[in-house]
UniProtKB/Swiss-Prot annotation:
Residues 2-31, 39-68 form the 4Fe-4S ferredoxin-type domain. The gene is psaC. It catalyses: reduced [plastocyanin] + hnu + oxidized [2Fe-2S]-[ferredoxin] = oxidized [plastocyanin] + reduced [2Fe-2S]-[ferredoxin]. Apoprotein for the two 4Fe-4S centers FA and FB of photosystem I (PSI); essential for photochemical activity. FB is the terminal electron acceptor of PSI, donating electrons to ferredoxin. The C-terminus interacts with PsaA/B/D and helps assemble the protein into the PSI complex. Required for binding of PsaD and PsaE to PSI. PSI is a plastocyanin/cytochrome c6-ferredoxin oxidoreductase, converting photonic excitation into a charge separation, which transfers an electron from the donor P700 chlorophyll pair to the spectroscopically characterized acceptors A0, A1, FX, FA and FB in turn. It is a peripheral membrane protein. [4Fe-4S] cluster 2 binds at C21, C48, C51, C54. [4Fe-4S] cluster 1 binds at C11, C14, C17, C58. Its EC number is 1.97.1.12. Binds 2 [4Fe-4S] clusters. Cluster 2 is most probably the spectroscopically characterized electron acceptor FA and cluster 1 is most probably FB. This is Photosystem I iron-sulfur center. Its main location: plastid. One of its GO terms (cellular component) is chloroplast thylakoid membrane. Its cofactor is [4Fe-4S] cluster.
Length: 81
């Protein structure tokens, strides 16, 4: 079952989600939108097991990284209108 990993622009570049991921789905990439000059990226979503450890590790008030399990709809991802 495939899962979708979405990174929001509230990411502060702390790397907590990257370090928490047991399957190395996430990595940091350069980004000028935050003080750390980097943002999480999810280039290997096919390896996501849906454990949501990245979500648990995120220190921001609004989770900057979210895992949408294969059974969740596009509406829950905010893509439907």
């Amino acid at each position: 079952m495939s899962h979708t990993v979405k990174i929001y622009d509230t990411c502060i570049g702390c790397t907590q989600c990257v370090r928490a991921c047991p399957t190395d789905v996430l990595e940091m990439v350069p980004w000028d939108g935050c003080k750390a000059s980097q943002i999480a990226s999810a280039p290997r979503t096919e390896d996501c097991v849906g454990c949501k450890r990245c979500e648990s590790a995120c220190p921001t008030d609004f989770l900057s990284v979210r895992v949408y399990l294969g059974s969740e709809t596009t509406r829950s991802m905010g893509l439907a209108y």
